């Protein structure tokens, strides 16, 4: 199991996702990695605060990171996520820290 302290940020994750890092530092917190899912050539690490860190499996570098919505949570846990994580994801969404898939569709981003 990976730990967040053992990972390093890529340029993309550190500079281009600085807005997300600020929200995580100020409001959500980093937490601990509770699940690792391997697909598309990299690990998607879920933390207990509702974050997903996309990590390169060979170099242990964080490629990108995002805050989960409920749709992604159910995908990661095969429609059986733990209750505490559902509550945390709902808390993040209700505070506006997550742009949900539906909101992105309305804004024309997808």
Predicted regions located by residue number:
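Ribonuclease/tRNase effector modules and their secretory precursors
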Residues: 1-110
């Amino acid at each position: 199991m990976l730990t967040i302290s053992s990972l390093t940020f890529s340029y993309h994750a550190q500079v281009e996702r600085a807005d997300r890092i600020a929200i995580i530092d100020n409001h959500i917190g980093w937490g601990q990695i509770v699940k690792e899912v391997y697909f598309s050539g990299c690990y998607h690490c879920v933390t207990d605060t509702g974050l997903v860190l996309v990590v390169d499996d060979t170099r242990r570098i964080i490629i990108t990171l995002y805050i989960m919505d409920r749709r992604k949570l159910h995908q990661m846990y095969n429609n059986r996520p733990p209750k505490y994580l559902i509550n945390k994801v709902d808390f993040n969404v209700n505070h506006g820290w997550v742009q949900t898939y539906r909101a992105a569709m309305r804004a024309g981003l997808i």
